[in-house]
Amino acid sequence: ESGTVNLPGIAGLYAGVKFVRAHRAEIEEYELALCDRLRARLREIPGVRILCDDGQAHMAITSIVVPGHDGGALADALDAADIAVRAGLHCAPAVHAWLGTLQSGAIRFSPGLYNTAQEMDDTALLLARLLQA
């Protein structure tokens, strides 16, 4: 074996795993609240289709389609504003075929522990502006 073992990296990984295990419930609750807030704001934007059932248990992921708009171009515009999303089929073409989004794909938002409620509002506001342009 060549080189030096990355002990600081191993220690950092251990500390991160330890933190997440200790606060898993709080992290999940916070991330789900962010997604609920984002979905509420997205529902206010005409033409946005949210790909989930209301009232069902969810992960902290929200996917949308906007008929008549290129998801990749919208994702690029959001990225230019430092809003990280993923556009496409998300390695799930069979699900997209079932949803009727196989041709368009979707835009996926996955807020995390270090995101804020204000960022959810800002994200929806920017998306609304992009769709009006």
Residue spans for each PLM region:
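Structural signature of PLP-dependent enzymes
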Residues: 1-10, 14-39, 51-58
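Buried hydrophobic packing segments
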Residues: 13-16, 95, 123
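Acidic-histidine catalytic/liganding microenvironments
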Residues: 42-46
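Conserved PLP-binding catalytic core of the aspartate aminotransferase-like
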Residues: 32, 48-93, 97-99
